[in-house]
Amino acid sequence: MLKKKLSLEDEDDDRSYNLRSSRSNAKSKPRSSAGTATNPRASKRARLSGASATQEDSSLVDKIRLSFEDFDEALSGFKVSSGYERSKNTDLWVDKYRPRTLEELSVHKKKVDEVKLWFQESLDFLKNGLRNNVLLVTGQAGVGKSATIHLITSILGVTVHEWNAPIPTIWQEHVHNTSSGLKYTSKLDEFENFVESTRKYGVMASSSTDGIKAPVVLLIDDLPLANGRHAFERLQNCLLLLVKSTQIPTVILITDHNNADSSDQTARRMEDTQSSLERAGALKVAFNPITKNSIKKVLQRICREEHCKVTTMEIDQMATASGGDIRHAITSLQLFSVKPELNHTKIKSPRPGMEDNYHGNEQTMYSGLDSGISSCFGRDETLSLFHALGKFLHNKRETDNVIISECSSSLVHDEFARLPLKMDAPEKVLSQAHGQAGRVVDFLHENVLDFVSDGAIEDAWCVSSYLADADLLLADIRGKMSGHNNTEDVPQSAGASVAVRGVLYGNKQPCSSRWHVIRKPKLWQVEQSSIQTKKNLREQRNISYEGSRVADISVMATEYSPVLKWLSYRASPDAFPGMGEETDEEDSDISEDDEIQDW
């Protein structure tokens, strides 16, 4: 007992122990010879129970040391799968096989030449007087925007100063900084400070061994996230200021949103930002998605270098599932090569009801590959808003034989029976298209009559009835910003579902398949005009009454505005030369209408 107490006191005094040495000492200790099948958790409980009488600090030390012992015991029984034949190199293939020459770039040669020509002209603008210092490169993710810029600058010997986005602040760090008295600075604020310092002081050019300063290019690859209209206006003003005042060649990379998200406010605001930068003098070069054949060539080259056991059909399916994103395709290939036996098992198992013709039908094999690869490593299936609208408006259905076999035992009247649709459930299509309820209904209102046969008056009446019901469900969001108009709310989801299913159900005699142009809803123009008119009335009310709310907008529009216009005309008739004549013409028109009504 005395020895045990002395040993515990020694452990108490030794506060500066090394956890790594404790771990290695724990490994070197021999196992107990009491039995060959000793339970490690039982021994852990025994050791902990033996140390329960010690002081609190010694107990914590023992727990940490014993946790390392258990971790070592778990690692001793871990074995690497024999099916994993890859090397121990953990480098990402995206970085390992990045292009090092212009020939290795998968970007279209015309786009590369445009970027290279801009660099050559902007670097010697002092000779030819060019002042186009900003290049705007757009395109979806993984089309080689940054790779092209870095490769061309390295070939031309240009030093790239890149804007490095700050590390995001987690909530615990924010709480700690707030308690310490540090003020939180958003990423947008830091970007504005960076642009301001770049405008004022520029960037330092590095000198070569010969003492000649290398040309400098500023690269902005990761714009801060702007959430909301006010934040977007700040970001847009900051970029416009940079375009108008920068003295060094500047490249701004903007990643376009997917077409499936085209109905989002963020996508439209980014398009407005790009247009404003072009008007300010920036040169825009839009990168297209990488072609399927180019992606397949890159994947085949990587397979030869890495000795991957991937078939040509699998490479073709990966290239198709990438959607023009070469970075996504290379990452999918690397993930696919980690456990090839599991991936092949998933791919070779056809869907139910397809066993008979799976091996004989190549299209079925591709669908099996799609279900295997896309579910594991591919993107979630998405649709553009116009693709979804095309499915709803064209209303393609199966043949007559299907309805007889499936609905022969049902009690549905022939008048209400419909053929099965050649698509998924309408709600699933809406979710894949990220369609906002109000926008979907507006598009259907504007374009549905073009897809109804000329003599199908009852179909047009039925479709209009369902669309009216959808308008009733969506009445609360009319006139609001579309950022609050989403399909997550129950009334909006119900309204979108009623509108879509009403169009599909009511149009029994759709027009034959031909080219149709989807028109933009005219209602949007009316709403924008209404919003602008209300804004002008608010400004006029604030100016006239010094900000005091003396009248509602409707009262301003119906009473005060006509009176103010009439008073302005009485005060200075020359300012409104045609007002009196227009009034006389209006009176004559009204009198003629009255005569027609009396007759």
Curated annotation (Swiss-Prot):
Q: Does the keyword Nucleus apply?
A: yes
Organism of derivation: Arabidopsis thaliana
Protein name listed in UniProt:
Cell cycle checkpoint protein RAD17
Biased composition annotated in UniProt, kind: Acidic residues: 581-599
Using the UniProt annotation, give all residue ranges assigned to the region (Disordered).
Answer: 1-54, 575-599
Do the record's keywords include Repressor? Answer: no
Give the matching Gene3D superfamilies.
1.10.8.60, P-loop containing nucleotide triphosphate hydrolases
Q: Name what induces it.
A: By genotoxic stress and by DNA damage. Negatively regulated by the key immune regulator SNI1.
UniProt gene name? RAD17
State whether it acts alone or in a complex, and with which partners, per the record. Answer: Interacts with SNI1.
Residue positions binding ATP: G139, Q140, A141, G142, V143, G144, K145, S146
Where it sits in the cell: the answer is: Nucleus
- GO BP terms: defense response; DNA repair; regulation of defense response; regulation of DNA repair
Q: State the function annotated in the UniProt record.
A: Seems to be involved in regulation of DNA repair correlated to non-homologous double strand breaks (DSBs) repair. In vitro, involved in rapid but not in slow DSB repair mechanism. Required for effective immune responses that involve activation of DNA damage responses.
Q: What happens when the gene is disrupted?
A: Suppressor of sni1 mutation symptoms including the accumulation of DNA damage leading to a constitutively activated DNA damage responses (DDR) and increased basal expression of pathogenesis-related (PR) genes.
- UniProt GO MF annotations: ATP binding
Read off the lineage from the record.
Eukaryota, Viridiplantae, Streptophyta, Embryophyta, Tracheophyta
The highest taxon in the source lineage is: Eukaryota
Enumerate the UniProt keywords alphabetically: ATP-binding, Cell cycle, DNA damage, Nucleotide-binding, Nucleus, Plant defense
Provide ranges: composition bias, Polar residues. 18-41
List the GO cellular component terms: nucleus
Which family is this sequence assigned to? Belongs to the rad17/RAD24 family.
Principal place of residence? nucleus
